[in-house]
Amino acid sequence: MVYLVDDETVVREALAWLLRSRRLLSEGYGHAEAFEAFLATRDLVADWPDAPVCLLLDVRMPGTSGLVLIERLIERGLIELMPVIFLTGHGDVPTAVAAVKRGAFDFVEKPFSDNALVDRVQQALAASSEAITRRRARQLRQQSLAELTEREREVMTRVIAGLANKLIADELDISVRTVEVHRARLFDKMSVRSAVELANLLREADG
């Protein structure tokens, strides 16, 4: 899905036609406030759709500008899941460049080449797909962490600290065999084969 936010109806219609001709779905909004109202109707961070999305956004619009909107998207944590491509006139190129430095995916200067724009849209959708995959994997890791027992968590903190099974057993006042069982269950639940993999996975889950 490609969201279009531009105050010029003729631009939105032309973009929609172009995207439709390339078999890309789109949905248009005449101003940033309308798009924000759409976003407010759903918790996109907690329940992001499986299909990739991107946003074609005009830099200058009456009311909320594209620059203000992208700042709000950044605040909501949506900028990776929904890459933003700015549509800009020649005089706004420096502004668009600054927006890219803030997190926008890219900008396209008007008048633009159809093929060039579609190429950037497809690249943005690919980036969205990758971000959705990373997010889903992170959610699964966090779910696995939530399913650990208290004892498995105690063993886990010591495993990633580099403690040997004997030391873990002494600290927790349990047998080495019991530590081995908890360690095996921990590795199985977290789908890892070593303490190094476990430590790396936990860092990714926190990210």
Question: Which role does the model predict for each range below?
Answer:
Residues G30-H31, S65-E71, S194:
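Acidic catalytic/metal-coordinating carboxylates
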Residues D43-L57:
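Active-site beta3 strand of CheY-like receiver
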Residues L57-D58, T88:
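Active-site residues of response regulator receiver
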Residues M61:
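Receiver (REC) domain active-site loop signature in two-component systems and cognate sites
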Residues L67-E80, A98:
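Short amphipathic alpha-helix used as the core "switch/output" element in two-component signaling
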Residues P94, V108-V121:
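C-terminal output helix
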Residues A184-G207:
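Basic, Lys/Arg-enriched C-terminal extension of HTH/homeodomain DNA-binding domains
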